[in-house]
Amino acid sequence: MIRTKLSKVKEIRTPHGKKVRWLISKEMGAPRFEMRHFTITDESQPSEEAHPWEHQVYILSGEGIIKSGDTEIKVESGDAIYIAPNEPHLVQNLPQQKFTFLCIIPAGCEDRVKE
């Protein structure tokens, strides 16, 4: 069993100003999945991304927008989202909203922000 506490995990800023904390990772002994906690504020710059792995996202607080191609959905606390491998996507907060969510990805993904 692995246990972590959000307040004890180092916060890292992505190049676009998102704040991420790696709650569970391969380095901690999780062989198949990793869990990240994201915070997006008005200081963050939205950027479209696509990765060869799937994402599962659970919205904790605030409201935001998730865009994929021509589809744009408003999301809020309690929503769960699946993003397929290689699906272009953009996640952003609504103005003046602190937006937090969990993102679950397969363990060992290559191009990730970690320090």
What are these regions (language model features)?
Residues M1-R32, V113-E115:
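A short, N-terminal "cap"/entry segment at the start of jelly-roll beta-barrel domains
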Residues T39-I40, H51-I66, I104:
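Short, conserved beta-strand element in jelly-roll/cupin
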Residues R21, R36-H51:
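Conserved short histidine dyad/triad with adjacent acidic residue
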Residues P85-D111:
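Ligand-binding loop in jelly-roll beta-barrel domains
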Residues P46-E48, I66-K67, I83, H89-P95:
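Short beta-strand His + acidic residue motifs that chelate non-heme Fe in jelly-roll/DSBH
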Residues Q56, E63-I65, E72, P88, ...:
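Structural motif
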Residues T71-P85:
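Short acidic-glycine-tyrosine-enriched beta hairpin
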